[in-house]
């Protein structure tokens, strides 16, 4: 998946891809971030699964010392992995901003290039009218999260002249992912 997002190490001749460097194909610019984000998410899922099974066992009366030890292990894993996932996600976002600014603009519903860009919590992106209807925004927060500066500039979708992903699916998929993570 990371190669499809940030393809490197190939040449294109008459519509056919030819690998020039397998090293670059595999270890492309987004590979370490996507791998770490997905691997950590898998471990975090396992931690919650462990806690869920332990809770189920405790509710069924099988609450010996082993059940609570496993529950504590799952809770400790989650306590370490959840903040780590936020940090890895931030690094992944910075990498995506560098290599796929149109995707970031679609994820955030940013139409015009702006500094101090607001974070859109909710809204309905409209590609025809180039706006996000009923948007609930937090001023400056998108710039702070994505550039680590209140006055950071985010390129808007209008900069990409149609060369961007469909906005609504990307906008909503990102919110679903964050919602599940929260």
Regions found by a protein language model. Name each.
Residues 1-182:
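Polytopic transmembrane helical bundles with strong interfacial aromatic enrichment
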């Amino acid at each position: 998946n990371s190669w499809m997002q940030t393809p490197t190490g190939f040449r294109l001749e008459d519509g056919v891809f030819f690998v020039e460097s397998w090293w670059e194909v595999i270890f492309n610019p987004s590979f370490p971030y996507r791998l770490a984000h997905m691997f950590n998410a898998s471990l975090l899922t396992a931690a919650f699964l462990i806690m869920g099974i332990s809770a189920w066992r405790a509710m069924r009366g099988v609450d010996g010392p082993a059940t609570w030890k496993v529950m504590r292990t799952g809770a400790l894993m989650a306590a370490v992995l959840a903040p780590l996932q936020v940090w890895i996600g931030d690094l992944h976002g910075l990498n995506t901003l560098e290599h796929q600014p149109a995707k970031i603009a679609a994820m955030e519903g940013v139409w015009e290039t702006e500094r101090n860009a607001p974070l859109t919590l909710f809204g309905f992106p409209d590609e025809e009218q180039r706006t996000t209807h009923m948007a609930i925004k937090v001023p400056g927060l998108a710039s702070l999260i994505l550039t680590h500066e209140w006055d950071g500039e985010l390129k808007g979708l209008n900069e990409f002249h149609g060369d961007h992903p469909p906005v609504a699916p990307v906008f909503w998929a990102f919110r679903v992912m964050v919602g599940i993570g929260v």
